[in-house]
C-alpha cells in the first residue's frame, strides 16, 4: 500500500487566514523575478509563511496581471456552454481555454446563470407538444358532451312522440308500426308503475286506527279499574307480609323458651319425672301380678 503524496509543508508552521498586502507584494515581486516553476519551494524562497497551494491559488485567482474582472460576455458564456457539453465539470480544463478567467469563476457562473438558462430553454422547446395534448383533451371532452346532448335530445324526442301518439290515437286509426311500438312501450311503463304502487300498498302492515276523540267515561272506568287492581295487590302483599312476620315471631319465641329451659336445667327434671312415673307404673304392675298369684 502506497502512502500517497507527501504533504508540501508542515501545517503547524504555516500561516492561515486572509492574505495581507505585504504578503501579496512579496508574492508578486518574486514571481515577476523568478517565475513559478515549483510552487512547493516558492514559499521558502520568497520568505512567505504560507503553503505552496495557498500561494498558487492566490496568484491564479487574484494577483496575476492578465486576470479579467467583471461580468462574462455572451461569447464567453457560449464557449462555456460548449466546453461544458464536451468536458463536463472539468473546470480547470475549461478555464485553460478562456484566458483571464479562473476555474472558480467559471464554476460559479455555470451554477448560478447558465445551468438555469439551459433548463428554461429546453422547457420552452418542449412546450409546443403540450398544446396538442391539451387540444386533444379538450376535443375528447367536447365529443363526450356532444354525445350526452345527443342522447338527451333523443330521449326528449321519444317522450314527445309518445305524448303526440297518445293524444292523436283516437283520430288516426291506421298508424305506423313505429308508433304502435312506442305506444306499447308507454303502456308497459305505466302498467309497471301501477303494479309497483299496488305492491307497496299491499306490503304495508295493517295498522289499527285508534280515534283520538273517545268517550271520557271509558277512560274514567279504566282508571278506576287500574286503581282497584293496585289496591287489591297492595292488600294481598301486606297480608302475606303480616302472616309471615307472625310466624317468624312465634318461632323465635319457641326457640327462646327452649334455650331458657336448657340453661335452667328444666329438661333434666322432666326426664327424671318420666323415669319416676315409669318406675311407679312398673311397681304397680308387679303388685297387681302378685295379687293375682295369691
From Swiss-Prot:
Subcellular locations according to the entry: Nucleus
Domain HTH myb-type intervals: 11-63, 64-118
This protein's record includes keyword DNA-binding: yes
Chain positions covered by the region annotation Disordered: 117-177, 229-253, 266-288
DNA-binding residues: 39-63, 91-114
Induction, per UniProt: Slightly induced by UV light. Triggered by salicylic acid and jasmonic acid. Regulated by the SND1 close homologs NST1, NST2, VND6, and VND7 and their downstream targets MYB46 and MYB83.
Reported tissue expression: Expressed at low levels in stems, roots and siliques. Specifically expressed in fibers and vessels undergoing secondary wall thickening, especially in inflorescence stems.
Record keywords: Activator, DNA-binding, Lignin biosynthesis, Nucleus, Repeat, Transcription, Transcription regulation
Phenotypic consequence of gene deletion: Reduction in secondary wall thickening and lignin content.
CDD domains: SANT
Any one Pfam family match given in the protein's UniProt record, by short name: Myb_DNA-binding
Keyword Repeat: yes
Biased composition (Basic and acidic residues): 138-161
Polar residues: compositionally biased ranges: 162-174, 229-242
Protein name: Transcription factor MYB63
Organism of derivation: Arabidopsis thaliana
Amino acid at each position: 500500500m502506497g502512502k500517497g503524496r507527501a504533504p508540501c509543508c508542515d501545517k503547524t508552521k504555516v500561516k492561515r487566514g486572509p492574505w495581507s498586502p505585504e504578503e501579496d507584494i512579496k508574492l508578486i515581486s518574486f514571481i515577476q523575478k523568478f517565475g513559478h516553476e515549483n510552487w512547493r519551494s516558492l514559499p521558502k524562497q520568497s520568505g512567505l509563511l504560507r503553503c505552496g497551494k495557498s500561494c498558487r491559488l492566490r496568484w491564479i485567482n487574484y494577483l496575476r496581471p492578465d486576470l479579467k474582472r467583471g461580468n462574462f460576455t455572451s461569447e464567453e458564456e457560449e464557449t462555456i456552454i460548449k466546453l461544458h457539453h464536451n468536458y463536463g465539470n472539468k473546470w480547470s480544463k475549461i478555464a485553460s481555454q478562456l484566458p483571464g478567467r479562473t476555474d472558480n469563476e467559471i464554476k460559479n457562473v455555470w451554477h448560478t446563470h447558465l445551468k438555469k438558462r439551459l433548463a428554461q430553454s429546453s422547457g420552452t422547446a418542449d412546450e409546443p407538444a403540450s398544446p396538442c395534448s391539451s387540444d386533444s383533451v379538450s376535443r375528447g371532452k367536447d365529443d363526450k358532451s356532444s354525445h350526452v346532448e345527443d342522447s338527451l335530445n333523443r330521449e326528449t324526442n321519444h317522450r314527445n312522440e309518445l305524448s303526440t301518439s297518445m293524444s292523436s290515437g283516437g283520430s288516426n286509426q291506421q298508424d305506423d308500426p313505429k308508433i304502435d311500438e312506442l305506444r306499447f312501450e308507454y303502456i308497459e311503463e305505466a302498467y309497471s308503475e301501477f303494479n309497483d304502487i299496488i305492491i307497496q300498498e299491499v306490503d304495508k302492515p295493517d295498522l289499527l286506527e285508534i280515534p283520538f276523540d273517545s268517550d271520557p267515561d271509558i277512560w274514567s272506568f279504566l282508571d278506576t279499574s287500574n286503581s282497584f287492581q293496585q289496591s287489591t295487590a297492595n292488600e294481598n302483599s301486606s297480608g302475606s307480609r303480616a302472616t309471615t312476620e307472625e310466624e317468624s315471631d312465634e318461632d323465635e319465641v319457641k326457640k327462646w323458651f327452649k334455650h331458657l329451659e336448657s340453661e335452667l336445667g328444666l329438661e333434666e327434671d322432666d326426664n327424671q319425672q318420666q323415669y319416676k312415673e315409669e318406675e311407679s307404673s312398673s311397681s304397680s304392675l308387679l303388685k297387681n301380678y302378685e295379687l293375682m298369684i295369691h
